[in-house]
Design a protein with these regions (language model features):
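Active-site-adjacent, His/Asp/Glu-enriched structural segments that form or flank metal-binding
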Residues: 52, 62-77, 81-172
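Sec-dependent signal peptide recognition
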Residues: 2-9
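Short secondary-structure junctions
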Residues: 20-26, 107-111
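A broad, low-specificity signal for short, low-complexity segments enriched in glycine/proline
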Residues: 20-24, 42, 81-87
């Protein structure tokens, strides 16, 4: 009986607490985030952060995902996400990965991407900012991911196997 009383009291307390929340209220904006919109329509968000010191994170989100694909295109957004790491206009082949790993950004842990039903996201985390040119290079990579993924035939053939293996292991 004591457990039942405690359970009812806890449920009542939670219900009362939840009743105080208005789900329609907007989440307050972080006053330290600078936002803006470029002429090309891209919205940006910049926030200064001291931790970890001497490092920055870069993310770019594209409103492209599986929901835009028809039956003949299933998996295309995910495939393109993979291809972004196989060369761009300014960093052909594996130059992007080689450069970022040379400055301390590890592929997989700090350099990655993901595709969902409505979005594809690319990220570089813990990019060192102390050496001149690294921030410019990171911004160039974001630019290339948005406009200039190389899509070389040999890289497409190579990545096809990677995607097929990923699908095989996901299904098991």
């Amino acid at each position: 009986m004591k457990k039942l009383t405690m359970l009812v009291a806890a449920a009542f307390a939670m219900t009362s607490a939840m009743a105080q929340l208005n789900p329609m209220e907007p989440i307050p904006a972080d006053k330290d985030v600078r936002t803006g919109k470029l002429e090309n329509g891209m919205t940006y968000y910049i926030r200064h952060n001291e931790k970890p010191k001497g490092q920055a994170d870069f993310h770019i989100l594209h409103d492209v995902g599986a929901i835009q694909e028809n039956d003949a295109q299933q998996g295309l957004a995910h495939f393109l996400e993979h291809m972004a790491f196989n060369g761009t206009k300014n960093l052909p082949g594996k130059q992007m990965i080689e450069y970022l790993e040379k400055v301390g950004v590890k592929f997989g842990a700090n350099l990655n991407a993901g595709t969902s039903w409505d979005m594809t996201s690319y990220m570089m985390k813990d990019v060192p900012t102390s050496r001149e040119g690294i921030i410019d290079s990171a911004l160039l990579i974001l630019h290339d991911w948005s406009h200039f993924i190389a899509l070389q035939p040999e890289e497409i053939d190579s990545e096809r196997g990677v995607i097929m293996e990923e699908l095989r292991t996901r299904d098991n």
